[in-house]
Amino acid sequence: MNKKERSNFTGTLGFVMAAAGSAVGLGNIWRFPYLAAKDNGGVFILVYIILALTFGFTLLTTDIAIGRKTRQGPLTAYGLIHKKWKWLGGLAWIVPVIILPYYCTIGGWVLKYMTAYFTGQTEAATGDGYFTGFITAQTAPIVFALIFLTATGVVVFCGVEKGIEKFSKVLMPILVLLIIGISIYSLTIKHTGDDGTIRTGIDGLKVYLIPDFRGMTFRDIFMVVMDAMGQLFFSISVAMGIMVAYGSYVKKDVNLMKSINQIEIFDTAVAFLAGLMIVPAVYVFSGTEGMSAGPGLMFISLPKVFNAMGKVGTVIGALFFIMVTFAAITSSVSVMEAIVSGLMDKFHLTRKKSAVITTVYAVVGMLVVCFGYNIWYFELKLPNGATAQILDVMDYLSNNIFMPLVAILSCILIGWVVKPKTVIDEVTRNGEKFGRKKLYIVMVKFVAPILLALLLLQSFGIDFVQFVTNLFK
């Protein structure tokens, strides 16, 4: 695609809303609260914020700067940074290709639950076998996934300004208002258990926020750092081509550093509010042992919590799943856009052709994922010890292998091959100040690659702490 014809976000607000929409996804809602509750509440939040300002800032800045400098999507951008590294673009582009089918499948699950709360099926949705019965059915999951994919495809088909930007500007403020509203309500509830124990939302807030360092070992602290880094890494949409694609649509006169700071604040605030919304509510009705992660939290634990609230729980549940739908679709739009922009730039296709090709691929991929829970069901032991089906295998490959690998290689490319000045010059091209320049240089050259390598080792089931302990025995 000709660079002169390339679409643009209209300004800073459009870019920030779109990038924040990508970053604020299911990971913020179903993983952040669980990790915060598991990892001593305030300890996890403190570590997460520190990493967001250092590690996350470095990776986010790198991806966005590469995109704006080259004015290309992920498939071709890295080759323009350094000819011998164009293969890295292909590696980065594979990530959204793997993610899109299973993300839209999960989006279909969210739509199913939202529909249940609007059609009077709230009692049924709390049943122990409801979720399993739905995902193992041969037709319903496909129908809901297709609806979700269609909505995603329409937004991407409409383009950057009239599609992605316009959509994000409308949905993101609504999403934030819903999260704030539900969070406030979560703090007001209380419940008396069968044993007479009274738990309140404020008690849950204390569990969420107050750090407890008592009895924490080096291993415990290390695992909190790994959990926080893993969550942040997946949350800000780096190393998967998305921020490179979005960066390529940013006008040259936009203050990149200011925009990146706003994206950081937005994503961290929403992640924090997600915890504020979920942890107190689950604690009130189920205690700390009621917290789980992933689909178990969203589709099993939370419906039971909403049901325990009584009639008001139906309203809260409906609002919650509307909010989750918005979060899921803004993220799926960004995943599809990373694929589409790559096709447009590499093969000089029109947006419409690229969007149609990507949608057709996603339909085939979704069928494979959905059938993985029934006619093609299997259980595979992963290197990290988890038992996986098709969706889990795709998630493991994209999130645990390819993304850390792409991020490590990006750090090597910028930190050692073309030097950090490449990114710094792009960020400061209009005379803007690079507020954390020295930090960025140290992080991209040394700290980030080491942390990412540890994250990658953990994905292969390698216990770094135990490994170091054995060395010094």
Task: List the model feature ranges, each with a label.
Residues 1-30, 59-64, 68-80, 86-87, ...:
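Membrane-interface "cap" regions at the ends of multi-pass membrane proteins
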Residues 35, 39, 65, 80-81, ...:
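Membrane-water interface regions at transmembrane-helix termini and the short interhelical loops
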Residues 8, 14-15, 22, 138-143, ...:
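Loop-to-transmembrane helix boundary motifs in multi-pass membrane proteins
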Residues 11-49, 241-242, 258-261, 265-268:
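Transmembrane helix-boundary motif of multi-pass solute transporters/channels
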Residues 88-91, 137, 347-359, 395-452:
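C-terminal membrane-solvent junction of multi-pass transporters and transport-like membrane proteins
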Residues 8-19, 45-47, 84-97, 143-148, ...:
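Select transmembrane alpha-helical segments in multipass membrane proteins
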Residues 3-6, 34-39, 72-91, 104-163, ...:
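Inter-helical loop and helix-membrane interface segments of multi-pass membrane transporters/permeases
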Residues 2-9, 169-329, 333, 353-354, ...:
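Membrane-embedded translocation segments of transport machinery
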